[in-house]
Amino acid sequence: MLYFESLKDKFKLNKKQLNKFVFYYEFLKKENQKMNLTSLISLSDVCYKHFYDSLILKEIFDFNNVTNLCDVGSGAGFPSFPLKILYPHLKIIIIESSLKKINFLKQLASHLELDNVCFFHKRVEQHDIAKNGSYDFVVARALARLEIILKWCVPLVKKRGYFIAMKGKNFQQELEASKKIIKQMKVKLVSAKVFELPMQLGTRTNLLFQTE
């Protein structure tokens, strides 16, 4: 429980939230044996490379003022499900191309009693254009090169809304290569937050953009 206690202390989790993260880990570990949801399945990896990495977004943005969050390429639910546990008021929209991951997330949402979660089984570039400009906040974690995910994700963001690209430590080259598309899509880089995961498990960068 040491890893979970560190999450509790860092992110001020209550007992109910902490229990949900414990269940999340156990359910992910169990289902991963059947369907290969993630290669990072040790307790330390899940707690820090998945849960911590997701929850740290609260340090660069106040999600209390966000109504809906669209997670593009959510995989096993990161970062949207940890954020939903922390901020139960959020409406979560999942866009995921893998049906097995969608089915896993539907089961997990039911077990965790997470309401107001919508699922779209499709690639983001196939998402209904009528949904463009619908979302307060869009996030993509380790999905593709920055210039590609900007093209995919920015159209989903409402006017004056936000998009976060979750990247590793070598983000500068991608950012440089994306200057043209950033200008074309009329978004501005608000912040680039670099942080270290606990136990020297890696460096992460969260790039926060705002639409005009």
UniProtKB/Swiss-Prot annotation:
Q: List residues binding S-adenosyl-L-methionine.
A: 73, 78, 96-98, 124-125, 141
Q: Which residues form a coiled coil?
A: none
Query: One Pfam match, by short name?
Result: GidB
Q: Which SUPFAM superfamilies match?
A: S-adenosyl-L-methionine-dependent methyltransferases
The record's GO molecular-function terms, alphabetically, read: rRNA (guanine-N7-)-methyltransferase activity
Cellular component aspect of the GO annotation: cytosol
Q: Which UniProt keywords apply?
A: Cytoplasm, Methyltransferase, rRNA processing, S-adenosyl-L-methionine, Transferase
Q: What class of enzyme is it?
A: transferase
What EC number(s) is this enzyme filed under? Answer: 2.1.1.-
Xref: InterPro entries = rRNA_ssu_MeTfrase_G, SAM-dependent_MTases_sf
Q: What is its main location?
A: cytoplasm
Q: Report the locations given in the UniProt record.
A: Cytoplasm
- Domain of life of the native organism: Bacteria
Q: Which Gene3D superfamilies match?
A: Vaccinia Virus protein VP39
What is this protein for, i.e. what is its function? Specifically methylates the N7 position of a guanine in 16S rRNA.
Question: NCBIfam families of this UniProt entry?
Answer: rsmG_gidB
Q: Which family does it belong to?
A: Belongs to the methyltransferase superfamily. RNA methyltransferase RsmG family.
HAMAP family linked to this entry = 16SrRNA_methyltr_G (MF_00074)
Q: What's the protein here called?
A: Ribosomal RNA small subunit methyltransferase G
Question: Which organism is this protein's natural source?
Answer: Aster yellows witches'-broom phytoplasma (strain AYWB)
